[in-house]
A protein has these predicted regions:
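N-terminal basic, low-structured, amphipathic or hydrophobic segments
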Residues: 1-47, 51, 56-63
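Second-shell loop/turn segments in exported
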Residues: 100-101, 166-175, 194-203
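Glycine-rich catalytic cores of cysteine/serine-nucleophile enzymes that process amide/ester linkages
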Residues: 87-167, 365
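A structural motif
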Residues: 176-189
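Boundary at the C-terminal end of the N-terminal hydrophobic targeting segment
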Residues: 76-80
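Bacterial N-terminal signal peptides
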Residues: 64-73
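Bacterial Sec-exported substrate-binding components of ABC uptake systems
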Residues: 83-84
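Activation targets extended, charge/polar-rich intrinsically disordered C-terminal tails
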Residues: 190-449
Length: 449
């Protein structure tokens, strides 16, 4: 029987059997007129409310005391009865996955494992679970409204499955007292309750690595710090993970604002699974090391690397050079179409960044200085050029001067800004400067109309 339902029924019986002056006026009137009194799970007929069957006030107060004790004690007793007591030989460990092929595996993963052979229990607690079937998944992710959750899976099965996909799996056995193991187990199980399991995901400050860090800190009473990160910024810590996926890295770099260019504190540096593992290895539990030993359960398989020549820097540079050579040896007259296309693409990208940076709740996307060269109004100018053809209205010519000057200023002063930019930005800016110069100085650039 559900103990919560039992307590509710008990309360209904005590209330329905009470004297009329303890009932609400409406309930008393219903009883006097012969109507039934429906409370929760009960439907009590008027015959049950006769004076002979009412309970004396002294006994009623005693019932209220008993009721209060039941309401307070039963849920606690149920919770304690539901969770077993871990054996002294139970093992608690931090599981770390290396990066995998899929985008959501790009940074690896962290989980907590509790294994008790005596209880035949092997539970792996993951804080990075999400559902692709969530309505408007990508919109919610970008806006910062996507809920992640903690989930538990059989440890051995999960680890073998991950290893079979080629990801490396390592295990740090933790030195915890019996009381700390039990408290950790109870804390994780409490997190699994429906009202506790969901949380707002934060790419850096609240993810699958920071959650295990937080719960281990609460249990041990000590901070977990990654001192090996030095004075690196969040962006610098992410950069090595983008060498294999340069185009995705370029897109993420455009989205991330200046706030990720501040140095990460030793505690914040644990937002990456590999850094959390290093931090736990160097952390202490009281006067002893927090780690007993490290085991490599599955070695990582080599991931396919992308050729640097196919990355954004070389591709954009190559496009610019080929474009310039075609222009240099052209036979036909000048066309504004390439410049209009360039401005339209820049403006469209800037419009997207502007909307995202103001609309999102994610702090990592705020204060984006890429908007100084991906100017949203370029979109209007580019579309205008398509329709203006060779004729350049006065306002359009002034806007081309504005685009030329801002691009040149950005090229010369970007290193002074509080945000670090992808190297692929500079070939794109060089193309924009060149195309604007062709429109503004046709005689000096050898343009034939």
């Amino acid at each position: 029987m559900d103990r919560g339902s039992f307590a509710h029924r008990f309360f209904c019986r005590a209330f329905s059997a009470s004297p009329s002056f303890l009932r609400s006026p409406r309930a008393a009137r219903r009883a006097e007129t012969g109507q039934s009194l429906a409370l929760g799970y009960l439907d009590i007929a008027p015959s049950a409310l006769t004076p002979e069957r009412r309970i004396p006030i002294g006994r009623l107060r005693l019932w209220h005391v008993v009721l209060l004790l039941l309401i307070l004690v039963l849920p606690v007793a149920a919770q304690e009865g539901r969770l077993p007591r871990l054996d002294d030989s139970a093992q608690v460990s931090l599981i770390t996955y290396t990066p995998g092929e899929e985008l959501y595996q790009a940074f690896g993963h962290s989980a907590i494992r509790i294994k008790d052979d005596l209880l035949n229990m092997d539970r792996l607690y993951n804080f990075g679970v999400f559902d692709f079937e969530t309505p408007d998944f990508y919109l919610k992710f970008v806006h910062g409204d996507l809920f992640y959750q903690i989930a538990v899976t059989p440890g051995e099965e999960e680890i073998r499955m991950v290893g079979a996909y080629g990801q490396g799996v390592s295990e740090l056995l933790l030195r915890l007292s019996q009381d700390q193991k039990q408290r950790l187990f109870e804390a994780l199980e409490t997190n699994l309750l429906p009202e506790n399991r969901y949380y707002h995901y934060d790419f850096i400050l609240d993810n699958c690595s920071t959650r295990p860090r937080d719960v281990l800190e609460r249990i041990t009473g000590s901070q977990i710090l990654e001192r090996g990160a030095g004075n690196q910024t969040f962006r610098q810590m992410l950069d090595p993970y983008f060498t294999r996926i340069p185009w995705i890295g370029f897109g993420i770099s455009l989205l991330l604002g200046a706030k990720v260019d501040r140095p990460a504190s030793p505690r914040e540096a644990c937002f990456l699974p590999a850094d959390l593992e290093r931090a736990v290895q160097t952390s202490e539990n009281g006067e002893q090391s927090l780690t007993l030993e490290r085991r490599e359960l599955f070695p990582p398989e080599a991931l396919a690397d992308s050729s640097p020549l196919l990355g954004p820097v070389w591709v954009f540079s190559g496009v610019g050079i080929v474009w310039f050579l075609f222009w240099l040896f052209r036979r036909k007259g000048h066309s504004v179409f390439p410049t209009a296309l360039c401005l339209t693409i820049f403006g469209l990208t800037g419009t997207f960044l502007l909307i995202v940076s103001f609309w999102t709740r994610l702090w990592v996307l705020h204060e984006n200085y890429n908007l100084l060269w991906l100017i949203p109004s370029h979109l209007i100018a580019g579309l205008w050029m398509f329709f203006a053809a060779k004729r350049q209205p006065f306002l359009l010519r002034w806007y081309l001067k504005f685009a030329f000057i801002t691009a040149c200023l950005f090229l010369g002063s970007s290193f002074l800004l509080p945000q670090r930019f992808s190297p692929a930005v500079y070939p794109l800016l060089a193309i924009l400067v060149w195309r604007c110069a062709l429109e503004l100085f046709p005689g000096r650039t050898g343009v034939r109309s």
